[in-house]
């Protein structure tokens, strides 16, 4: 997490092997082939362009590693190219954009379904629940030297 206060709350709660104060994309870029699985629930709503993050996730995964995440769904998915910043300061993403961004980063989409990802103001917030696997061909998601 970026917030040391949130890390402290997580530390108090317990149950974690490691807690790190870091920006997500930077952290993934510094951990080449370290993970078999990356799970990100309700985090990527703070990213518009997912390209760099997905490249870094592929870089951080071991061969054939898995990536599971959620993003908010655009209201009218067919008419929205890519992603947009909403009035609640969260981004929503179209299905086509997520699919294209995964492919460009070297992932194979294994499952993508509409789901309620959270409740907000008493209303269900619809999103995409995504499961992807790192493909054999991998673009370089390593940090620039």
Which role does the model predict for each range below?
Residues 1-28:
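Class I SAM-dependent methyltransferase SAM/SAH-binding core
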Residues 69-90:
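Short, glycine-/aromatic-enriched active-site segment of Class I SAM-dependent methyltransferases
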Residues 51-66:
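A short glycine-rich, Lys/Arg-flanked "PGG" loop and its adjoining helix->strand segment in the class I
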Residues 105, 116-145:
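Core SAM-dependent methyltransferase catalytic element
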């Amino acid at each position: 997490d970026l917030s040391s206060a949130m890390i402290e709350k997580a530390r108090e709660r317990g149950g974690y092997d490691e807690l790190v104060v870091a920006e997500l994309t930077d952290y993934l870029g510094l951990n080449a082939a370290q993970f078999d699985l990356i799970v990100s629930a309700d985090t990527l709503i703070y990213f518009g362009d997912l390209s760099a993050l997905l490249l870094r996730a592929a870089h951080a995964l071991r061969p054939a590693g898995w990536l599971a995440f959620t993003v908010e769904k655009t209201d009218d998915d067919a008419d929205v190219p890519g992603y947009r910043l909403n009035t609640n300061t969260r981004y929503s993403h179209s299905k086509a954009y997520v699919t294209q961004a995964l492919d460009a980063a070297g992932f194979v989409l294994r499952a993508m379904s509409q789901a309620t990802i959270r409740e907000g103001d008493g209303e269900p917030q619809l999103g995409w629940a995504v499961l992807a696997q790192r493909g054999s061909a991998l673009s370089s998601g390593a940090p620039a030297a």
